[in-house]
């Protein structure tokens, strides 16, 4: 029987999560909430659940928040490198669990993102790139991002699109903010 390969599975590598909280301490509250989603962090719990599905594998990527939403471009680029190094390490350590990952970028550092996409794919083995549906409030088709998309086209790998929103973004016109927190799972852009 062929393996089940889930291509949209989020994970917080510990090194990345610790650095994210360090550079964005205002995320401490959401960090506590995210920690309650055990399988984002706890590999034993994740593997136990994966085993319930037989030969089940995950292509891993980062969850919200987008790097560019929490860090200046120079700091964000380093955070993307930490994430990509950590996800590549997980894939090397557990190839039967995590055969591949989608690389993280900091889209507000265009030149850095081009270089990081190439490094993640060519040196670390990323099989694509995860992008959020807006970049710090700007659409993905903003001309500033064209060099990133040109590099991604050259790499000829898939782009994962992650919906993004915040509690401050209303789900309906009559709301002042998201009443039911649908932004956790739906938000285009």
Predicted ranges, named:
Residues 1-189:
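Helix-coil boundary/capping segments in enzymes
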């Amino acid at each position: 029987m062929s393996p089940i390969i889930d291509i949209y599975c989020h994970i917080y590598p510990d090194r990345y999560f610790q650095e994210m909280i360090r550079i964005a301490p205002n995320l401490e509250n959401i960090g506590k909430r995210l920690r309650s989603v055990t399988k984002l962090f706890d590999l034993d719990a994740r593997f136990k659940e994966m085993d319930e599905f037989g030969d089940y594998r995950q292509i891993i990527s980062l969850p919200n928040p987008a790097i560019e939403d929490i860090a200046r471009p120079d700091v964000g680029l380093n955070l993307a490198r930490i994430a990509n190094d950590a996800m590549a390490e997980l894939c090397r350590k557990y190839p039967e669990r995590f055969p591949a990952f989608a690389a993280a970028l900091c889209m507000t550092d265009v030149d850095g993102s081009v270089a990081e996409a190439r490094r993640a794919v060519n040196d670390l083995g990323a099989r694509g790139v995860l992008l959020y549906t807006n970049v710090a409030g700007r659409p993905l088709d903003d001309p500033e991002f064209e060099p990133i998309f040109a590099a991604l086209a050259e790499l000829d790998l898939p782009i994962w699109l992650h919906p993004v929103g915040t509690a401050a973004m209303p789900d309906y016109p009559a709301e002042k903010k998201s009443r039911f927190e649908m932004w956790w799972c739906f938000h285009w852009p």
